[in-house]
Design a protein with these regions (language model features):
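A surface-exposed partner-binding patch
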Residues: 1-98, 147-148, 152-153, 159-163
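A generic structural motif
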Residues: 92, 118-120
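Compact, glycine/acidic-enriched structural inserts
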Residues: 117, 125-144
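Low-complexity, glycine/alanine/valine/leucine- and proline-rich hydrophobic stretches
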Residues: 101-108, 116-118
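A generic structural signal for short, non-catalytic loop/turn and secondary-structure boundary residues
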Residues: 83-84, 108-110
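Short, surface-exposed beta-strand/loop "edge" segments at domain boundaries and coil↔beta transitions
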Residues: 97-100, 121-129
């Protein structure tokens, strides 16, 4: 789809999944290994999975858990909660502050987890019963996938690696 031919990344999924206490969707893992750090069409970024730094998938999940006691924080995500056996796990974002989560459930197959997303931290959350890869594809290519589509702004599909 993007013509990307970079070197495949090695990711320690066992450690990430051990800390989360759940497996992650196979298509997300495949995308991370094939593309590594970067952005699709200069817009949609997957959170880094090669570290536990504050901007990584694990770092953002940890920070969200730590702030969850704040009632204003919880109100911004109602009716959902941060993942602890079930709940939201942030996996991606856009350069315009859109946020992409799984509505994860450790007792269910990760391939069945819906996507919950919003275009802005103060906007409403939208639920999509699609895989991670389908969600990414629709954001980039489906002009009718509102309010998340950037298809009308993207002339060709590409992946821009970071660092």
């Amino acid at each position: 789809m993007t013509g990307w031919q970079g070197e495949r990344q090695k990711v320690e999924w066992g450690e990430i999944e051990r800390r989360l206490e759940t497996r992650l969707p196979a298509d997300f893992k495949e995308i991370c290994e094939v593309f590594g750090r970067g952005a699709f069409c200069g817009y949609l970024e997957l959170l880094p999975v090669d570290s536990a730094g504050p901007r990584s998938l694990l770092g953002r999940w940890t920070a969200m858990k730590e702030r969850w006691a704040n009632p204003r924080m919880r109100a911004r995500f109602e009716p959902y909660q941060v993942f602890e056996q079930s709940g939201l796990i942030l996996w991606g974002q856009s350069v315009t502050e859109a946020s992409y989560y799984w509505l994860a459930d450790a007792s269910a197959s990760p391939e069945t987890w819906p996507i919950v997303a919003r275009t802005d931290p103060l906007e409403e959350l939208h639920r999509f019963d699609v895989s991670t890869s389908e969600f990414i594809c629709r954001v980039l290519t489906d002009r009718d996938f509102r309010p998340f589509s950037v298809a009308s702004k993207v002339k060709s599909l590409y992946f821009e690696p970071y660092g």
